Amino acid sequence: MSSLGKLLKLTLLGILLSFSCKFVFGYFNVNQLFDHEFIKVFPNFKGNVEAKIKYPTVVYAIGDIHGDFPNALDVLSAAGVVSPVFPHEWTAGNATLVQTGDVVDRGPDTRKLFRWFNDLHKQAEKHGGRVVRLLGNHEFMNAKGDWRYVHPGDKASYPEPSEENRIIDWGHSGEIGNLLLSEYNVTYKDNTTGSHFMHAGLSPEWAYREETVNELGKELLSHFMSREKIPEYLEDFWAIEGPMWYRGLAQLSEEEACEVALNVTKTLNVNRLVMGHTPQFHGIVSRCEGRILLIDTGLCSAYAGERAVLRISQNDTDSIVEAVYRGKIVKL
């Protein structure tokens, strides 16, 4: 069949599947199908596939996982981000997945999760997608030797002497330590959807310093790994109102939170602030007409909260923001 014939066949297939899946499931990401199938039909194509489709990507976000691989797999596979079948590879095409930190503590699967997300990152890149991995306060705590919430199964995953080997792993030369310093950040801004992601959140004062947050976070992490006294200029970063611990957007009254959110979104030039850190056990919470999205749903077994993934997609006029649960999708 000629290339034109293949393209016409592919286009017709996409239209039919789009309508079918929209009626059956209520949602369908035709962009991801087109991207994936176009490359299969035209493997030598050198142009920009994304330029051929109107809305090139969907953004997913998952909050605190806390050492629970089965529950993370369950909700990410339900959302269509990964395969439910071993080895649980990336299935979201050219989408972006943001994990907002706190992979570690409370559960046994820390090492498995870090390796899995690293593999997903590599797999996503092959399809034009990406996996953005952010640092939570618990990653910093483990780097500095604060192991109060470490699950016994996490320690047992290391060969003896397990504690010594775990210290090495979380240091500069360790697998996890090196990964955190080289691949992870504190904040991520998605310009396509106008969304700002991080673990805890930014106060108005820190919003003005947002461009320095990732660099300061890496500096602090490195000091913690070295067990060094942190410099005075980093103390505010680790303070209760700093970027790794701030809970104002989750815990302030509605009026106060909305005032802060309006201030911060204007400063950052974004539409919404997405964060984990403060558990919302009944599901993803939208505050202030969607300016604040709280996505830590306590999905780990230690908390037994709802399992949910945030999904942000585009239409002609706006972003479509949804909470994806197993068996249902809730528009936020």
From Swiss-Prot:
GO terms for molecular function: endopolyphosphatase activity. GO terms for biological process: energy reserve metabolic process; polyphosphate catabolic process. Keywords: Endoplasmic reticulum, Signal. Residues 1-26 form the signal peptide. The keyword Endoplasmic reticulum applies. GO terms for cellular component: endoplasmic reticulum; fungal-type vacuole lumen. InterPro entries: Calcineurin-like_PHP_ApaH, Metallo-depent_PP-like. It is found in: Endoplasmic reticulum. Pfam families: Metallophos. Gene3D superfamilies: 3.60.21.10. This is Uncharacterized protein C1840.07c. It comes from Schizosaccharomyces pombe (strain 972 / ATCC 24843) (Fission yeast).
